[in-house]
Amino acid sequence: KNRKVDKAEIKKRTDEFLNLMQIMQYADRMPNQLSGGQQQRIALARALVISPDVLLMDEPLSNLDAKLRVEMRSVIRHTQKSVGITTVYVTHDQEEAMAISDRIAVMKDGVIQHVGTPRDIYQRPKNVFVATFIGRTNIVNAHVKDGIITFADGYHEHIDALDKAAEQDVRCSIRPEEFIICKDGTD
């Protein structure tokens, strides 16, 4: 109404988003008659009806139980894709960020540490904070010289990508799934 849109258009767009969110059957219920997930879907549908250029979602799933959070992640991701509205999604939940986002900005003390795709942030973190914030990792000290990385125990490996790297001490992030167990004497 405040946007000077006629009632028929409001009804049409409201129904469109209620259907998209799979909550048409709850359209006439009062908030106290809805579950937490239904309330979240209604709130999202209301926000989408006005066709914003950008949608800000600040911890939208923080008050939901674990099962409902997973379900709502899927609903939000599907809605983002089908509607095509740029969404800024604020969360402290790394799993939620990785599941919903096309691009992620990881912040520490109000300073952006890394912006990238979920895969980029996970596999090529810009610093130790980002590496340890997203997923599990092992941080080990090493030294790089002439394309060879040498660890504290003396183990070393030539890595082509390090051929042009300046000699320096480094910290390596090694994800648990990257470890391969071999029998003694095998490479």
What is the meaning of each model-derived region?
Residues 79-80, 141, 162-163:
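Short secondary-structure boundary/capping segments
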Residues 148-187:
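Glycine/charge-rich catalytic "coupling/switch" loops of P-loop NTPases
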Residues 123-145, 173:
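C-terminal boundary and immediately downstream tail of ABC-type ATPase nucleotide-binding domains
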Residues 27, 134-135, 160, 180:
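Generic, ordered loop/turn and secondary-structure boundary motif
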Residues 1-129:
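ABC ATPase nucleotide-binding domains
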Residues 106, 126-127, 135, 139, ...:
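Short helix-capping and hinge/turn segments at secondary-structure transitions, especially at repeat
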Residues 109, 144-146, 176:
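Residue-level signal for tight coil/turn positions that link beta-strands
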